[in-house]
Amino acid sequence: MNRHSTAASDRGLQAERTTLAWTRTAFALLVNGVLLTLKDTQGADGPAGLIPAGLAGAAASCCYVIALQRQRALSHRPLPARITPRGQVHILATAVLVLMVVTAFAQLL
């Protein structure tokens, strides 16, 4: 297959691949939140122990909303001039880093 036929067959799939990637990330964050909730309800540390699970749920929700926005942006033709989600990626990366720190701190208690 040459480059032109690959590009022609790939037309429109960028939005689906992007949505799948963001959705997988959201699902991983959601599973993290569920596992933290199960661990913390078993340990009965009180409501403060559920903070990491809440953060994971919030990060998963944000990630899913970003996935929907990205799919909508990439489905427009012609593509918008700026299609990189820099601000969204920074927000989500910060949320994941905060989640990691809070989870690590909660595990130490």
Curated annotation (Swiss-Prot):
Q: Name one Pfam family in it.
A: DUF202
Q: Can you say where in the cell this protein is located?
A: Cell membrane
The name this protein carries in UniProt is Uncharacterized protein Mb2296
Q: Does the keyword S-adenosyl-L-methionine apply?
A: no
Transmembrane stretches in the record are 18-38, 48-68
Alphabetically sorted, this entry's keywords are: Cell membrane, Membrane, Transmembrane, Transmembrane helix
Q: Provide the membrane topology annotation.
A: Multi-pass membrane protein
Q: Name one GO cellular component term.
A: plasma membrane
Highest taxon in the source lineage? Bacteria
